[in-house]
Amino acid sequence: MQPHPRLAAAGRRTSGLGLAAAGALHLLWATGSPWPARSRDALADAVAGSPAGLPPAPLTAAVGAGLLVASAGTATTVAPRVQNVVRGVVGTGLLARAALGGRRTTVLLGMPAPSATFVRLDARAYRPLVAVLGAAVLAGIEPVPTCRALRA
């Protein structure tokens, strides 16, 4: 079942903006800014689950760049068939992250158990936001005419 064209357009806009904002934030963190936290230690505790430190700047920048590429891939309609595959992969990945939660995700990534601050923020903000973004990405999947429909 395909979403209504307006729903698909809203999903593309929402997911494009959300992923672009997350990408820009990661690029900002890669420069050394702790915003919106007061310090890099507080930021590390809130977003990485460990006051011991943040991932290296190049890795954070790579995540930011990847989010910006995902934003472009989910928000545009240049090659619908390819972009629907991209949307399916990105949307499913985001929903899987939301379903697993930050605690399980950090374990799967081989990281130490996350702090109580991270677990609380994950439950209240990160998981719901990631779930909404995942649903928006999937809502952006648009109908692509089949060969039969083109012949008719």
Question: PLM features: what roles do these ranges have?
Answer:
Residues 1-152:
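Short amphipathic, positively biased membrane-proximal segments
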